[in-house]
A protein has these predicted regions:
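N-terminal accessory/pre-domain segments preceding catalytic cores
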Residues: 48-49, 76, 80-130
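Hydrophobic/aromatic-rich core segments of domains that either
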Residues: 4-94
Length: 130
């Protein structure tokens, strides 16, 4: 799970004095769109750089490809969250379905929370070409 991997990476980085923060959203590669979690870490002199440990080090002889997921981003990433487990506004009355992320939203009614299997969401992606 990319969220657990990200939280583990962030914990290990912080234990070693490396500033990190959470990001999550959607990975919108054609044919592979899905929810996704990753983080950024602060590296002098570059500032905040993306780290996507879920994809790891690529098996490539090309060093640019091999290390791409450390400090680079692809054009298919849609950032929705810059932190995790934050309060919602307006506040929910019932417990949240997702306590860490907030990519797909939350739904509740006067009878309680509606977990993800009780409702659907959809999105349409239009890829632009030059």
């Amino acid at each position: 799970d990319c969220g657990i991997q990200t939280l583990l990476f962030m914990t290990l980085a912080r234990l070693n004095g490396i500033p990190v923060h959470w990001q999550s959203g959607f990975d919108l590669k054609p044919g592979e769109d899905n929810l996704h979690d990753w983080c950024e870490m602060y590296l002098e002199p570059y500032g905040w750089v993306l780290v996507d440990q879920s994809y790891g080090i690529k098996n490539s002889r090309d060093e640019r490809v091999k290390w791409f997921c450390l400090g680079n981003t692809d054009p298919y990433r849609w950032i929705v969250n810059d932190d995790f487990s934050q309060p919602l506004y307006p506040a929910k009355i019932y417990p949240r379905s997702e306590t860490v992320d907030f990519q797909r939203g939350e739904v509740e009614w006067r009878g309680g929370n509606l977990y993800f299997d009780a409702w659907e969401y959809d999105y349409h992606i239009e890829y632009m070409s030059e």
